[in-house]
Structures are given as structure tokens and as C-alpha cells.
Curated annotation (Swiss-Prot):
This is Exostosin-1. Its main location: Golgi. It comes from Homo sapiens (Human). UDP binds at residues 267, 269, 271, 280, 319, 324, 346, 349. The gene is EXT1. N-glycosylated. Changing residue 565 to N: Decreased glucuronosyl-N-acetylglucosaminyl-proteoglycan 4-alpha-N-acetylglucosaminyltransferase activity.
Length: 746
């Protein structure tokens, strides 16, 4: 038996050896004959093979330097429909593989930072008001540059918003006009804004010209055509959308439970034929006429009667019974179904009204989805599951509804209430892509105050901002830096500035004192300053203008800043109490001198008053505590025009700081104690401090109020009637039981 096995193994080995020699010999002969041909061709002056010619060739899997358009055309015929083949040269599909890494030149942004250039408007070109607002928002931003050599991003002055060929706003011959721009460079580093694309009957997303490698900031863009980390999805907004500012959200107070008269509402057109008609034609199945009110009308378009169905008359009658605004403000959820295009005006209307949007538009890339978590503010539905929508929203807990409603208000006010905010959000998203090492995270974008007011260039650590202490489980700062703004020379040891310096230095919370010397006279000698237990740093301003008091000096070592005018009169106890109050409200201005604003109906302008009334809206920075971050925001967020105005007038810097902080926090400042007089009355009338007694000084502040309100687009100041006093303040109890007992004597 074993002999048979041995014979079988030998026979198998011999057969394998014979096969190996046979096939190997064939390949060897083929190789030799090929070699002879190559050698013969070499003798005749033809191609001579390289030494590594016979090594096997493998395709380069990485191919790091393949042009983007070559990648685009590669395997283009695989897995595409006949329609896609017909449209292969249209702008819908060209550049579909573009990403920041392949179609954006980062080197333009390294030298000068993120600067945006807007092409000059060409003669005879019509521009719609909405596009004018977009361009104005860019030109008024801190990103704008008029020098194309300094630019990182380019925006066309040609109106690209409405690319519906049936629209009167449609710009003809845009393809040739764009190609003739000398900076176009096939769209590289360009941003194109678009609200409407395509036309009847299919409303494709074709913008009608080759966008090349340009980015799209587009409304109603589908997830299929959206290029992640390259395009930006923006909301569809009307031509009446405000350019700046915008109305605040309509949620004035939180009701518990958060349920309203209607559970779910919608009022809009019903499309009888064509794209977008399926969902709206089926809404009547869900409508119950009680807490679910979904109304549609057939009365729109020129030939609606030609296509009207048996339900049209009944739907039109029901449609007229309800007021849309009344429904919107009294509904818990608002249905946002797709129209002819994926986006809808109902989306922004629902956000502003604190009506939780129920999205019913399959395939829509939601606005700013790259940074906004829409699950915190909306219910994402499915058109195929329309009949399940009512039961789904009824199952949502009341706590969740309240959280959704509050988030709608935050998102509306932070990113959508004006054209300017929509444009700036778009630019900030692109800037975060370019400078990823200092980009904002999801918490910043989805928590108050939002991504537009939190500048990552200030710090990459959230604990350095005053808004996230609770989220991070951090305590507010335990020390402050006193910054004293000095504008008069030292001529006497009894001057108020020296008394103020000593009082601030005695505070248990004081880490250091900075004297900002904005006086025309030279710095006094060191021995002229009093000895203190904390360091005293004297900084001489280079420009010596009013805005210099709010520069983000590196010398400020604490997050808390006690801002003081040189003639302020405060005791150590008052400083301590104000700081302990600020620790509970680190995002606000906390201090002593309060002022207010009002609307003057006779002059139709804002007014400024220092009269003592039952409310206030400003706390002046002559004796106030706030977070150091507001120095950075004042210097880098506000436009140069406002700061130049402050410097020229040598006035209004404290008002501008109050405008800024109220715009960020949406909250009023906090006044402490009932103290009214905070200035030294014995200051010499020849000093610059006597400007407070100058009537022109007060008139300038009136003018400043209106200029600031015009730039912000609304009045950000908020009135408050709250004043914080120490516990047992003025109570008829023993003085020994009171912590801040000296305050009552002042």
C-alpha cells in the first residue's frame, strides 16, 4: 500500500514538473522573440527599451498629481443614465468631484489671510435688489478688500441669483460674460451665489453656465449635487428679507407646557401637475380641521383651471377661512414640504415664529448643514411616510418641544434674520475650511452666541470665552485686571486717579493694574505712582485715541477687566461687590453708571439720556467689569468706520461697547447698587475730563446712537429694571451681619 502511495506521489511530481517546463518555455521563447524585435528596432534608430522594461508595470494607486478635470472624465460612462450622458457638458455635473483640496488654491490665503474681492460692477448690467444686498454685506464686512492681489476669495458682480430663464431677473449671455473676466481662472477660488436654478417643467439645478472650479452658495440644493466641504447650502429668502439686522424671533416667553392651539399647520400652493406635486396633493389625507390644519389652493398660475381636479373647489374654500399669520403664531409644528424646488420660504417663516419646522423635502441639503445640527431645531420627515407625521410629532415629549423651539430662535437670530448674516455665515464656513487649525467646533456653531460672534483667532480653547463656563464645568475667573484710562497729567498727589489706583489695588480680587497713558504730556516718573501690593504697569498709547482703551493688550493677564476712567470715584468695597456680581454674569457688562436710550417720535430717531428713570439699557465703561474677549471683539469685529468716528469725536466708545455686548448676548447689562454719582466733582475745569459738562459732548452721543444703530441694522440695546444690591442692603439689622457694610455709608 505504501509503495503505491510513493509511486503516485512521484508520478504527480513529474507531471507538475513537465507542465512547468512546458508553459515556462513558451513564455521564455516569447520573451526572447520580443527581445530580438526590440534589439532589431534599436539598431534601426527606433525606441530603445529602458533597463527596467521587463519589470511588471502596476498602475499608480495614489496618482497624486492627476488634474481634477482628468479625474472628472475618468470612467464617466460607467453607471450613469442616458440623461446624465446628454448633460455631461452642463454645469450640473462638471466639477462634481471638486473639493477644497483639489479645486481651491490655499496659497492665496496664506499671505494676507481671508480676504474677499468683489468684481466692479459693469456698465449696463442689471442687478436685483437681493444680489445688491449680498454684495453690500460683503463690502461692509471685515473680510472685504478692494485689491484683487490681496484676495483669497472672489465674488462676481454679475447677478447669478435667479437662473430661471422665465424670470425677468434672468441675466442673458452669462457664460461669455464670466469667461471674459481676467481673474476668472476657470472659477478657481470663486464663490457663486444662487437662489433659483432651472425652469419649467423639471427645474434642474443647472445655473446655465459652466461654473468650472467655483464654489456654489446655493438654495434648494440636493444632496446628490451638493459637493461636501466645497459648496454651501443657503436658505431660500425673499426679496423683502432685510439686508442687516432683521427682526428678532417671535418667541417672547416660554410657556409650560409648550403646546399651542394647533399641533401642525401648513398653508400654501398645491401643484396639480409636474415636479413637487405628489407631496402637496396628498396633504388632505392628514388634514383634520382641528389641531392638524394643512391647507392648499389650486389658484395660482395662468392655466390652473385647465388642470383643476375634483378637490380644488373644496380646497380653495377651506384655504380662505384661515389667516396664515394667525396659524403660524399659534402652532407647535409647521410643515415645510418641498415646492417646485426643494427649498421653501416656509422654512425661514417657521424658524422666526418659533414654530418647529417639520421638513418634508427628501434629498434637500439643509442650509448650513456643515455646521448646524438640525436635529436640535427641526423634525426631519420623509415624503414617503407622510401619513405617519401626525403620530410622530404627537409622541415628542414636551421638554423636547421646548428645546426645539428655543433652538429655532437661536438659529434664526444668529444666522438667518438678515441677508448679511446669511452671507457672513457662508464666508465664515469657508474660512473655517481654509484655516482648519483654528476652526470653530460644533458647540460654537450650535450654542449661544453662535459662530459669527466667537472668533477662533482669539483662542482655540473654549474656556477663554465667557459663554461656555457652564458647558465646560468651569468657574468664572477669580481675579481681575484694572485698566485705568488716564488723559490728564499728574500734577498733584491728591488727584483722583491716584486714589482710584490705591482703592483698586486693595481689592482681594485684583491681580494687577494697568494705567493706559493717553495724555499728551510725558509719562510721570516711577516715584510719582503710589506703592501697591499688586503690579502697576503703565502703557503709553501710540495713537492715544479713545478706541485704544479697548485694544486686546497682552499685558492683561486675567479674563476679567475692571475698566475705569481716571476721575472715577470707587471704594475697595464697591470694587469687590461689583466683581462678585460679575462672576455670576461673566458674559455681561456689570458696573455702576447707568444710561438709557429711547425712541424720539417727533424726530424719528434714537435718543440718549442720563436721567434717572425706572430702567436703563447701558452701563458705561468708566466704572464697569466685563470679559477681556470683548476687547478683541471690539478691535476685530467692528468696522473701521465706527472706530474712526469714535476716535475723531473722542467720544462714544462706551456706548459702542454696550452696543456690541448687547448684540452678542441679547441681554441687558447689570447695574449694581443705587449709586448715582461716580465722577470726581472737583476735577479742574481745564482738564479733558470736563468734556462731560460740554453740551456738544451730549449732542455727539445722540448722533452716535443713531449711527451705531444704522450699522447694526437694529437697536441691540435692551432695557432692564434690575439692580443688584448686597444682601441685607439697607435692612434694619446689625451692621455686623452685613458683608459689604461700607457701601451703605457711601
Amino acid at each position: 500500500m505504501q509503495a503505491k502511495k510513493r509511486y503516485f506521489i512521484l508520478l504527480s511530481a513529474g507531471s507538475c514538473l513537465a507542465l512547468l517546463f512546458y508553459f515556462g518555455g513558451l513564455q521564455f521563447r516569447a520573451s526572447r522573440s520580443h527581445s530580438r524585435r526590440e534589439e532589431h528596432s534599436g539598431r534601426n534608430g527606433l525606441h530603445h527599451p529602458s533597463p527596467d522594461h521587463f519589470w511588471p508595470r502596476f498602475p499608480d494607486a495614489l496618482r497624486p498629481f492627476v488634474p481634477w478635470d482628468q479625474l472628472e472624465n475618468e470612467d464617466s460612462s460607467v453607471h450613469i443614465s442616458p440623461r446624465q450622458k446628454r448633460d455631461a457638458n452642463s454645469s450640473i455635473y462638471k466639477g462634481k468631484k471638486c473639493r477644497m483640496e483639489s479645486c481651491f488654491d490655499f496659497t492665496l490665503c496664506k499671505k494676507n489671510g481671508f480676504k474677499v474681492y468683489v468684481y466692479p460692477q459693469q456698465k449696463g448690467e442689471k442687478i436685483a435688489e437681493s444680489y445688491q444686498n449680498i454684495l453690500a454685506a460683503i463690502e461692509g464686512s471685515r473680510f472685504y478688500t478692494s485689491d484683487p492681489s490681496q484676495a483669497c476669495l472672489f465674488v462676481l458682480s454679475l447677478d447669478t441669483l435667479d437662473r430661471d430663464q422665465l424670470s425677468p431677473q434672468y441675466v442673458h449671455n452669462l457664460r461669455s460674460k464670466v469667461q471674459s473676466l481676467h481673474l476668472w481662472n476657470n472659477g478657481r477660488n470663486h464663490l457663486i451665489f444662487n437662489l433659483y436654478s432651472g425652469t419649467w417643467p423639471d427645474y434642474t439645478e443647472d445655473v446655465g453656465f459652466d461654473i468650472g472650479q467655483a464654489m456654489l452658495a446655493k438654495a434648494s440644493i440636493s444632496t446628490e449635487n451638493f459637493r461636501p466641504n466645497f459648496d454651501v447650502s443657503i436658505p431660500l429668502f425673499s426679496k423683502d428679507h432685510p439686508r442687516t439686522g432683521g427682526e428678532r424671533g417671535f418667541l417672547k416667553f416660554n410657556t409650560i407646557p409648550p403646546l399651542r392651539k394647533y399641533m401642525l399647520v401648513f398653508k400654501g400652493k398645491r401643484y396639480l401637475t409636474g415636479i413637487g406635486s405628489d407631496t402637496r396633493n396628498a396633504l388632505y389625507h392628514v388634514h383634520n380641521g382641528e389641531d392638524v390644519v394643512l391647507l392648499t389652493t389650486c389658484k395660482h398660475g395662468k392655466d390652473w383651471q385647465k388642470h383643476k381636479d375634483s378637490r380644488c373647489d373644496r380646497d380653495n374654500t377651506e384655504y380662505e377661512k384661515y389667516d396664515y399669520r394667525e396659524m403660524l403664531h399659534n402652532a407647535t409644528f409647521c410643515l415645510v414640504p418641498r415646492g417646485r424646488r426643494l427649498g421653501s420660504f416656509r422654512f425661514l417663516e417657521a424658524l422666526q415664529a418659533a414654530c418647529v419646522p417639520v421638513m418634508l423635502s427628501n434629498g434637500w441639503e439643509l442650509p448650513f448643514s456643515e455646521v448646524i445640527n438640525w436635529n436640535q431645531a427641526a423634525v426631519i420627515g420623509d415624503e414617503r411616510l407622510l401619513l405617519q407625521i401626525p403620530s410622530t410629532i404627537r409622541s415628542i415629549h414636551q421638554d423636547k418641544i421646548l428645546a426645539l423651539r428655543q433652538q429655532t430662535q437661536f438659529l434664526w437670530e444668529a444666522y438667518f434674520s438678515s441677508v448679511e448674516k446669511i452671507v457672513l455665515t457662508t464666508l465664515e464656513i469657508i474660512q473655517d475650511r481654509i484655516f482648519k487649525h483654528i476652526s470653530r467646533n460644533s458647540l460654537i456653531w450650535n450654542k449661544h452666541p453662535g459662530g459669527l460672534f466667537v472668533l477662533p483667532q482669539y483662542s482655540s480653547y473654549l474656556g477663554d470665552f465667557p459663554y461656555y463656563y457652564a458647558n465646560l464645568g468651569l468657574k468664572p475667573p477669580s481675579k481681575f485686571t484694572a485698566v485705568i484710562h488716564a488723559v490728564t497729567p499728574l500734577v498733584s498727589q491728591s488727584q483722583p486717579v491716584l486714589k482710584l489706583l490705591v482703592a483698586a489695588a486693595k481689592s482681594q480680587y485684583c491681580a494687577q493694574i494697568i494705567v493706559l497713558w493717553n495724555c499728551d504730556k510725558p509719562l510721570p516718573a516711577k516715584h510719582r505712582w503710589p506703592a501697591t501690593a499688586v503690579p502697576v504697569v503703565v502703557i503709553e498709547g501710540e495713537s492715544k485715541v479713545m478706541s485704544s482703551r479697548f485694544l486686546p493688550y497682552d499685558n492683561i493677564i486675567t479674563d476679567a477687566v475692571l475698566s475705569l476712567d481716571e476721575d472715577t470715584v470707587l471704594s475697595t468695597t464697591e470694587v469687590d461687590f461689583a466683581f462678585t456680581v460679575w462672576q455670576s454674569f461673566p458674559e455681561r457688562i456689570v458696573g455702576y453708571p447707568a444710561r438709557s436710550h429711547f425712541w424720539d417720535n417727533s424726530k424719528e430717531r434714537w435718543g440718549y439720556t442720563s436721567k434717572w428713570t425706572n430702567d436703563y439699557s447701558m452701563v458705561l465703561t468708566g466704572a464697569a467689569i466685563y470679559h477681556k474677549y470683548y476687547h478683541y471683539l471690539y478691535s476685530h469685529y467692528l468696522p473701521a468706520s465706527l472706530k474712526n468716528m469714535v476716535d475723531q469725536l473722542a467720544n462714544c466708545e462706551d456706548i459702542l461697547m454696550n452696543f456690541l455686548v448687547s448684540a452678542v448676548t441679547k441681554l441687558p447689562p447689570i447695574k449694581v447698587t443705587q449709586k448715582k454719582q461716580y465722577k470726581e466733582t472737583m476735577m479742574g475745569q481745564t482738564s479733558r475730563a470736563s468734556r462731560w459738562a460740554d453740551p456738544d459732548h451730549f449732542a455727539q452721543r445722540q448722533s452716535c446712537m443713531n449711527t451705531f444703530a444704522s450699522w447694526f441694522g437694529y437697536m441691540p440695546l435692551i432695557h432692564s429694571q434690575m439692580r443688584l444690591d448686597p444682601v441685607l442692603f439697607k435692612d434694619q439689622v446689625s451692621i455686623l451681619r452685613k458683608k459689604y457694610r461700607d457701601i451703605e455709608r457711601l
